[in-house]
Amino acid sequence: MVKMQSCYLLVLPALLISFVEALSPAFSLCQLQKPAIQSPLLGCPSGTLFVSQSDPRANFTSVQQAILSLPTSGTATILIGEGVYHETVNITRGDPMVLLGQLDPATAFDPAGNASTRNLVQIWDNKFVENGLSDEETAVFTVSRGAGAHFGNVDFKAYNIDFENLAANYSISQALVTDISYANASFYGCTFAGWQDTWYTGHSGNTYVVDSIIFGQTDYLFGFGTAWFQNVTLANRACGGGITAWQGTSGTLNGAYIADSRIIRSPDANATTVTDEECFLGRPWNDLAIAVYLRTFMDESIAPAGFKPWGDGRNTIENTTFYAEFESSGPGGNISMRVPVEHLLTAEEAQQFTIEGVFLGTPEWIDFDYEV
């Protein structure tokens, strides 16, 4: 099957281009692996750098090496060849940037299933909070501002890459997968696998994640900024804290928004680590926390109350916190026993929670042509 698809790359490029529009028209042809007689950068934007641990035609063997080589201005694209990359990645350049994970033509057009089974690129590390390390310093992948800058990347995109923090097989402390702060960043068809604090949208961060899966146990969607998760799978590896743990800011819509998604017991969990009705949708990091679930399937692991207080002496959810649901489904989507402070939205009320509404306009840094 692989050879047949490779043959198509040689003789039917026009037909192939029509196929790749099912993913992202701008980049999918670039992402497909090519026959050895063709450049791996066929179909890529001009100036694209190629990273590979095995292909001698690569410009670099490390993702971070490629990033450090980039000029400070202009749009930059990096294609990452198939492989497992043990490194931390830190992006501080301000101009637009794209990271592309290579795809096998034989599986690239299969439904992702939000498990990223078609992804060929993994970036991992294993740091966790110890010996004075901060949360942010444990992140496998960071997009933030550089020294002296007011803001970082204005338009970062990543496609079909699996990011993982392998600090432990069970939460031992905070161990981030991502840190997106002072930047606009979007992710397509990716996986983020961790335990505690997997996903972090930090101060002045704006993030969009689609067609992806996020694994975690404790507060694994947390932060200060604005994060929209569209058509994702949230996979509970265990039940600790809540899925979301946000710190809101007065007068803003900073929060976590989960739409058209699924919450499930992680495939690597068991009945001991994820028991029925024990996982909470969130807990408030401060009393202005925002978390909204729209049209989301929730399995039997979700607690009937939905949300819980922070704990550690904060034993109530204040009415300044905004927790809300609309059209939840599945065994855990029964809203009859939700905490009284939660907002159970009507169809009219739910209409205010859109990408454009949350980000105060249509974000130019989101690839709306990406199709699931």
Annotate each predicted stretch with a short phrase.
Residues 1-25:
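Fungal secretory targeting signals
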